[in-house]
Design a protein with these regions (language model features):
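Glycine-rich, flexible N-terminal cofactor/catalytic loop recognition
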Residues: 2-84
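A contiguous loop/helix-start segment that scaffolds small-molecule binding in enzyme catalytic cores
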Residues: 2-9, 16-19, 27, 182, ...
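Loop/turn-to-beta-strand initiation segments
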Residues: 28-30, 100-105, 181-182
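Short active-site oxyanion
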Residues: 51-57, 130-134, 182-183
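General beta-strand structural signal in soluble alpha/beta enzymes
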Residues: 59, 133-138, 185, 211
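Conserved helicase motor
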Residues: 80-88, 162-165
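Glycine/small-residue-rich loop that forms an oxyanion/phosphate-binding "nest" at active or ligand-binding sites
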Residues: 91-144
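Class I SAM-dependent methyltransferase SAM-binding "motif I" and its flanking Rossmann-like core
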Residues: 121-179
Length: 309
């Protein structure tokens, strides 16, 4: 495989860790390296060192990775193209290099490989072949937006990009609506207005949404608003529809618990856990542990056990 000669191109924004005098060789393994999603200053020292020392770099698009690699002083990197269209066929070639004693660093155009980007098939193949997989964590659009969203509890479902076919998109949105919790979407600029309309049609209740546009880049915007206001916000300024998008859609607001709900019976999971645990420990201890497993209240589980005696 010939080396990729990177020359020319725009100067990257920001500064990155300076090259070390020497980069020690890496052990033969697959290194899954997160790269910046927009601002090159977000590259970690460990990621920079790994990329400099790797025998090979498996890149989603060597042209897109050029500014980053140039900024790290990797001007003659040995590159392998590994993208969505060739990952399955290329995986065995990559693994053969590792079996031969060489190290391979896996990167995507931006962010963490395998998260709405190629990489998962190669990583799975490496595990199946008994090859060591070493994560080198860093930037990810999902955690970047989550950190700036203010989501109580931080619990959400990661969906990423929806299918492009209308029927499949509708099915996924219906499933997300039925799930009832917050979820994360990625979207391209040419589909963002259509997505806003689809979300309003699929979701009931007064939900909130946090829109992250051009995260970590020069024109970054992070805006939190009612979901119903999203179409108007997009139309208010042509710039609002430009760039790459990450959206965190909150779950529906919690309904006040009625007296009837407050006195509802424990869940089936809680009752089953209580039944099994009561065979080996006192009822109150079993109720506390069953409550931790099921989310039910320990007192209700305990009272339910007493009624069954």
């Amino acid at each position: 495989m010939p080396s990729c000669q990177f020359a020319g191109g725009p100067a990257p924004e920001g500064t990155v860790p300076a090259p070390a005098e020497t980069s020690p060789a890496l052990a033969a393994a697959l290194y899954v390296v997160a790269t910046p999603i927009g601002n090159l200053e977000d590259i970690s020292s460990r990621a920079a060192r790994t990329l400099r020392a790797a025998a090979w770099i498996a890149a989603e698009d060597t042209r897109s990775s050029r500014p980053l690699l140039q900024s790290l002083g990797i001007g003659h990197a040995r590159c392998l193209a590994l993208h969505a269209h060739n990952e399955e066929s290329q995986a065995e070639r990559v693994l053969d290099r590792i079996r031969g004693g060489e190290s391979v660093a896996l990167i995507t155009d931006a962010g963490t490989p395998g998260i709405s980007d190629p990489g998962a098939l190669l990583v799975a193949a490496a595990h199946a072949a008994g090859i060591t997989v070493v994560p080198v964590p860093g930037a990810s659009a999902s955690t970047t937006l989550l950190s700036a969203a203010g989501l109580p509890g931080g619990r959400y479902f990661f969906e990423g990009f929806l299918p492009t076919r209308t029927r499949l998109r509708q099915e996924r949105l219906q499933a997300l609506a039925a799930n009832g919790q917050a979820f994360m979407l990625f979207e391209a600029p040419h589909r963002i207005e259509a997505l806003a309309a689809e979300l309003l049609q699929a979701l009931e209740g007064e939900r909130e949404v946090v829109v992250g546009r051009e995260l970590t880049k020069r024109f970054e915007q992070i805006v939190r608003m009612p979901l119903a206001a999203l179409p108007d916000w997009l139309q208010a300024d042509a710039n609002h529809c430009r760039g790459e998008f990450a959206l965190l859609v909150f779950g529906p607001p919690a309904r006040p618990e009625s007296d009837e709900t407050a006195e509802s019976a424990p869940s089936a999971l809680g009752l089953k856990a209580m039944q099994v645990l009561s065979e080996t420990m006192p009822p109150r201890q079993a109720a506390k542990l069953a409550a931790r497993i099921s989310g039910d209240k320990a007192d209700r589980l305990y009272q339910s056990a007493l009624k069954d005696k």
